[in-house]
Amino acid sequence: YYPRPHEDMTKAQVIIPALETLLTISGTLERPVRNIHFQNISFEHTSWMRPSYQGHVTLQGGFHLLDAYKLPIPGLPEKAELENQAWIGRPEAAIQIKCGNNINFNHCTFQHLAATGVDYERAVSTSIVENCHFTDIGGTALLVGTFPDEGFETHVPYTPFHEQELCTGITIRNNLIEEVTNEDWGGVGIGAGYVKNIHIVHN
């Protein structure tokens, strides 16, 4: 960190995040976590160390490459014109939710976060994010739904194995999203993968 001309570091208050994830909600397809409501809570200050240790090649939506290389001889049996291979990774999130029902955020603040803010990753249903403020986020503010699994080859078409894995009935409404994707220009304000009956309204 390089202090600005008016800053005195001997008097500065410094916050160094230690955690990459502040909250994890994780059920199973058979027994989802149900009926959790967060209201008027501020979720702040996360880190994301992977880019520092392993580098970072960004893809669309804030996803990244785990590994990639050029094929010595172009072409594979399933794709004759392919010249390179690459494997996808999903970024860390301050709030990670898998296999949940009725997991809601209302009038919450998400700020000073290194990677993704909130991630409804898989098999989340009938949940609402509304009247929230997302700001100063390094990657995507809000990510919803299944994308290729970790380590999936990026050139291979992806389809979820089971419809149960889809996020369904998610409402994202009346949120203020600003100053996001500050560190990862491949990120977005709101990203939706394989979802069903999603409502994104007035953000």
Please describe what each predicted stretch is.
Residues R34-H45, E81, N101-A115, V124-G139, ...:
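Right-handed parallel beta-helix
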